């Protein structure tokens, strides 16, 4: 046959639109491992939360204190099932909304409403 090449194959793949599509040739291009390094975007490093959740970082979990010094980032990397979340009992309402809001922010300033030095008696 002139004009095309085909081979017999029983390879099936899942595409964006269909599952188990028979193809004549397939190469798996998806990565199934990660080296742990995250890329900078426009020269700015990501904020890697490590064992902290976004809630633990924002609300001041003592285990997340090292993240307070981070002033800017290109994106936030939160690991699934982070150990250090909120350190008080209760449910964090609208957690997904907080994550969504922070996804478009590259920095913020944290301040104390009641500074310890001036607000509390010694």
Swiss-Prot record:
Main location class: virion
Membrane-related topology note: Single-pass type I membrane protein
Compartments (UniProt record): Virion membrane; Host apical cell membrane
Glycosylation positions in this chain: 7-8, 20, 84
Modification(s) after translation: In natural infection, inactive HA is matured into HA1 and HA2 outside the cell by one or more trypsin-like, arginine-specific endoprotease secreted by the bronchial epithelial cells. One identified protease that may be involved in this process is secreted in lungs by club cells.
Keyword Lipoprotein in record: yes
Quaternary state and interactors: Homotrimer of disulfide-linked HA1-HA2.
Additional notes on this entry: Major glycoprotein, comprises over 80% of the envelope proteins present in virus particle. The extent of infection into host organism is determined by HA. Influenza viruses bud from the apical surface of polarized epithelial cells (e.g. bronchial epithelial cells) into lumen of lungs and are therefore usually pneumotropic. The reason is that HA is cleaved by tryptase clara which is restricted to lungs. However, HAs of H5 and H7 pantropic avian viruses subtypes can be cleaved by furin and subtilisin-type enzymes, allowing the virus to grow in other organs than lungs.
Family classification: Belongs to the influenza viruses hemagglutinin family.
Protein's UniProt name: Hemagglutinin
Organism: Influenza A virus (strain A/Camel/Mongolia/1982 H1N1)
Species lineage: Viruses, Riboviria, Orthornavirae, Negarnaviricota, Polyploviricotina
Gene: HA
């Amino acid at each position: 046959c002139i004009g095309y090449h085909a081979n017999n194959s029983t390879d099936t793949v899942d595409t964006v639109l269909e599952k188990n599509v028979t193809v004549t040739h397939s190469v798996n291009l998806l990565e199934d491992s990660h080296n742990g390094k995250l890329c900078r975007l426009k020269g700015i490093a990501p904020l890697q939360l490590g064992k902290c959740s976004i809630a633990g970082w924002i609300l001041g979990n003592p285990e997340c204190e090292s993240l307070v010094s981070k002033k800017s980032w290109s994106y936030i990397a939160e690991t699934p099932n982070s150990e250090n979340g909120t350190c008080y009992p209760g449910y964090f309402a609208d957690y997904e909304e907080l994550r969504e809001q922070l996804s478009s922010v590259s920095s913020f300033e944290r301040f104390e409403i009641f500074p310890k030095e001036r607000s509390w008696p010694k």
